[in-house]
């Protein structure tokens, strides 16, 4: 990495300028805190850049209990509270799946729309500057989202500074904030336990089965009930569906996929609204 980029990372929390940013005419800045390391760092940068920032978190009712601790730690770091948004209709992902009779496809999952998009849209105002914690390797996805949502003003300070997720882990460690439990269990992202968007990832589901057997079994039963499979495996050169309860025994060996559930999933989620 270039020395200039390294320097940017070292001073990122002291910086008060977002590259190419501008406060919206209304003056309202909203940071979408997802309880992940990247969104925490992005929120802190936004606060030091803009001063007054409204921090919001969409509670899906299906994430790890340790997230409550992480939120409190981050609130102390931010020096202000996080506003929790919640669906008025559904308490968790399973209620969404059962009501919609659907889990996931290549076009997305209904849980994102109901538990994240709708609560977020209810507080959104035209002219808001929105802060998201997307990292340096996601710039192409941001460009696509901006093209399709030209009415929204988006700032991604981590992309502006070429900051990666690993950089964010290091920053939180330096300020004494313990990472969420899901990371420590080997999950790449701090998403819902048993995220159905982890498609074609047998190792991910082995990790869910190992640490969260109750959620694994509940999702497996829903697959059978709805006749929908989340995963496929390659056999004899062909991709074939496999139910969760058919996954062979054993511990996960590979790395989890980089599962996204937020800003870039929202356009897909529109079809389930």
Question: What are the language-model segments listed below?
Answer:
Residues 2-273:
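Nucleotide-activated chemistry modules centered on ATP-dependent adenylation/adenylyltransferase
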């Amino acid at each position: 990495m270039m020395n200039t980029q390294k320097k940017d990372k070292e001073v990122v929390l002291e910086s008060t300028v977002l590259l190419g940013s501008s406060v919206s005419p209304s003056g309202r800045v909203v940071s979408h805190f997802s309880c992940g390391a990247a969104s925490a760092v992005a929120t802190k940068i936004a606060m030091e850049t803009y001063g007054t920032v409204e921090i919001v978190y969409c509670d899906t009712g299906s994430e790890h209990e340790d997230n409550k601790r992480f939120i409190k730690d981050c609130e102390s770091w931010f020096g202000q509270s996080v506003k929790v948004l919640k669906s008025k209709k559904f308490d968790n992902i399973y209620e969404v799946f059962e009501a919609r009779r659907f889990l996931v496809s290549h076009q997305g999952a209904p849980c994102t729309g109901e538990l994240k998009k709708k609560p977020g849209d209810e507080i959104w105002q035209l002219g808001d500057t929105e802060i998201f914690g997307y990292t340096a390797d996601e710039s192409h996805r941001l460009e696509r989202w901006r093209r399709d949502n030209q009415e929204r003003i988006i700032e991604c300070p981590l992309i502006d500074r070429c900051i990666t997720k690993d950089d964010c882990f290091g920053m939180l460690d330096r300020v004494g904030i313990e990472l969420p439990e899901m990371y420590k269990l080997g999950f790449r992202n701090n998403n819902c336990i048993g995220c159905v968007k982890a498609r074609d990832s047998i190792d991910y589901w082995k990790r869910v089965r190992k640490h969260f057997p109750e959620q694994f079994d509940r999702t497996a039963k829903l697959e059978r009930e709805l006749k929908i499979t989340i995963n496929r495996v390659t056999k004899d050169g062909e991709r074939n569906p496999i139910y969760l309860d058919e996954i062979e025994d054993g511990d996960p060996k590979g790395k989890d996929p980089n599962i996204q559930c937020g800003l870039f999933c929202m356009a897909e989620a529109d079809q389930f609204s």
